[in-house]
Amino acid sequence: MDIRILKDKNNALLNRRELDFIVKYEGSTPSRNDVRNKLAAMLNAPLELVVVQRLKTEYGMQEGKGYAKIYENADRMKDVELEYVLKRNVAPGMETEGEEA
């Protein structure tokens, strides 16, 4: 899997970086969690502060376009992001103890 950043914008108002990217892959579409891990490693960002908002692929293409956000702190992320988006970005089996799967 190869990720190329198309646009990297700093949003000071919301304390986050906003990224437009293209992910190229072979085989099946990579999971949201795989893309999060790769982005965090590429940009030296803490994994828990990376949110993949969108990942779209076209039929028959081995690439997808995506939009991700990297927050400066977890409190700001929880204030801004919707709950279902945060749940999408948690790896299976990593939910907190108080939540049900």
From Swiss-Prot:
Keywords: Ribonucleoprotein, Ribosomal protein. Belongs to the eukaryotic ribosomal protein eS24 family. Coiled coil: none annotated. PANTHER family: 40S RIBOSOMAL PROTEIN S24. One of its GO terms (cellular component) is ribosome. The keyword Ribosomal protein applies. This is Small ribosomal subunit protein eS24. Pfam families: Ribosomal_S24e. It comes from Methanosarcina barkeri (strain Fusaro / DSM 804). GO terms for biological process: translation. GO terms for molecular function: structural constituent of ribosome.
